[in-house]
Amino acid sequence: MKAIFGNSFYDFEYLILKQVEVVGVLPEKFEEIISFAKKVAKNKKNLELEFSYPFNQDKELESFFSKSLDMNDVALITNPIVEVSKILRKLTKCKKVNIKLTSLRSPMCPIFHVDNIPCRFLVTLYGSGTEWIPHDEVDWKIFDIKDANKNPLKDRSKIKNFRTGEWSLLKGGSWQENFNGVVHRSPHNNEERLLLSIDPYS
């Protein structure tokens, strides 16, 4: 299994390949998006937004974020959400996507795990990026113990991090046969984070 990292949202379509487990993209306006996210993190300390987006409600999506965040420049985040949602529809044939934007002050998922869904977008807009382990470097015996103090790594392997502002599409456990899903967890610190997740929903 391998990971692909690029700067175009079209790269996400590589996830259809059996040998690809994750695709990460740092978009052209990522610095502007991070700056926007810093404002959100500063102004909204206990944020937990959720929106079900059925692809034909772009204005409703923008209005929801604008009202919820009390900010005018939400297109910086809603425009890329619309783009990647269309890619999810193409990859999974889903009818809509579920969007969550959450502020965190402690690890939401402290134990390495996989998501039992076809795939998931994870974007750390502010703070440390999600930690993950390439499939071929996972020690599955340790993984099955589910101990937060034991990293399920093979010898000489290292935990990897998605970059802040990077849009990452991870295969889940129900994507294809003979693949358990991308092993990942929240970073182990109490640093404030702003996390965006987007899931296909049938």
For each feature predicted by the language model, list its residue ranges:
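N-terminal auxiliary "cap/dimerization" subdomain that precedes the catalytic jelly-roll/cupin core
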Residues: 1-66, 71, 75-82
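Catalytic micro-motifs at enzyme active sites that drive phosphoryl/nucleotidyl and oxygen chemistry
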Residues: 11-12, 108-112, 183
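Short, surface-exposed beta-edge/turn micro-motifs
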Residues: 19-22, 118-121, 165, 192-193
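A structural signal for short, well-ordered beta-strand segments and their strand-loop junctions
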Residues: 23-26, 96-102, 123, 169-170, ...
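Short helix/loop capping segments that flank catalytic or ligand/cofactor-binding pockets
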Residues: 33-34, 132-134, 171, 178-179
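Extracellular-facing segments of soluble proteins and assemblies that are Gly/Ser/Thr-biased and enriched
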Residues: 67-106, 110-114
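Catalytic core of non-heme Fe(II) oxygenases with the double-stranded beta-helix
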Residues: 106-166
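Catalytic core of Fe(II)/2-oxoglutarate
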Residues: 152-202
